[in-house]
């Protein structure tokens, strides 16, 4: 509450805050969700430092990252930095479009909180903003993602962004995107510098998926399977290929069968 009152705290993804430990580890911890009140962990301010406690017992002094004030800067062609990027934890997310294709057609995922951005998507502005963060801000890796795009546009933008990043830095690039119907596209992703990739199935039960995710739920599980198998061929099976799932959205039997 102390940092929030000062307007300094930097929000993490999905109603969370990044806790910074003295050994350099950063933990992304939800705190604006209903389940947060059940946590045995709490953070106190003793007038000087922020203290992490477990069942009211001292664990460690921690710190937070401050607000990314660069979000309000404007690129040469009028794009606000915060509409293209999101700096949190150890990464810089770069959006590959401003608006989720499914949300634009009233088929967005009902659990998603990604909001559409104003203006036109301009790759030259995106590259300018990437340059700024590379030259002025410390972070470990890139994430290309945020919302779903129309297949060809999404794929072309991902390749353009990845290629630009790779020409200017060796930082790892993680892409979170839809599974391409043409899996050969994944070879182009890798050639353009992507190191990790994720196709998020979220819900196995396709009937429930189509209700909860009207657009994305229409993608057959076989398309995910084909993309994931091809990705493992390209990036290996040691953690560079993944898929996120939402536990509790379908019967546990369907979840385990998936």
Go through each PLM region and give its residues.
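Short Lys/Arg-enriched alpha/beta "domain-start" segment
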Residues: 1-40
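N-terminal [4Fe-4S]-dependent radical SAM core
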Residues: 24-110, 114-119
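Short, solvent-exposed beta-strand edge segments and adjacent coil->beta transition regions
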Residues: 89-91, 240-244
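Core AdoMet radical
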Residues: 113-129, 133-160, 166-185, 189-227, ...
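Active-site glycine- and acidic-residue-rich loops that bind
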Residues: 174-181, 247-257
């Amino acid at each position: 509450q102390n940092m929030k009152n000062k307007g300094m705290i930097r929000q993490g993804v999905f109603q969370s805050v990044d806790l910074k430990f003295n050994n350099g580890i950063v933990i992304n911890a939800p705190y604006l969700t209903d389940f947060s009140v059940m946590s045995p962990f709490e953070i106190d301010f003793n007038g000087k430092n922020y203290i992490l406690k477990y069942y009211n017992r001292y664990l460690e002094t921690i710190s937070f990252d401050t607000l990314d004030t660069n979000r309000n800067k404007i690129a040469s062609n009028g794009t606000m930095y915060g509409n293209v990027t999101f700096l949190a934890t150890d990464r810089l997310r770069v959006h590959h479009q401003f608006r989720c294709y499914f949300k634009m057609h009233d088929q967005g995922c009902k659990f998603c909180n990604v909001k559409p951005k104003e203006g036109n998507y301009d790759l030259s502005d995106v590259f300018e903003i990437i340059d700024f963060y590379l030259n002025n801000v410390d972070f470990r890796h890139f994430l290309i993602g945020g919302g779903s795009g129309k297949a060809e546009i999404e794929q072309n933008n991902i390749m353009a962004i990845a290629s630009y990043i790779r020409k200017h830095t060796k930082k790892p690039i993680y892409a979170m995107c839809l599974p391409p119907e043409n899996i050969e596209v994944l070879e182009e992703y890798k050639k353009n510098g992507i190191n990790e990739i994720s196709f998020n199935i979220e819900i196995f039960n396709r009937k429930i998926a189509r209700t909860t995710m009207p657009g994305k739920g229409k993608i057959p599980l076989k398309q995910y399977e084909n993309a994931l198998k091809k990705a493992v061929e390209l990036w290996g099976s040691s953690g560079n290929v993944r898929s996120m799932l939402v536990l509790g959205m379908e019967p546990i039997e369907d979840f385990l069968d998936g």
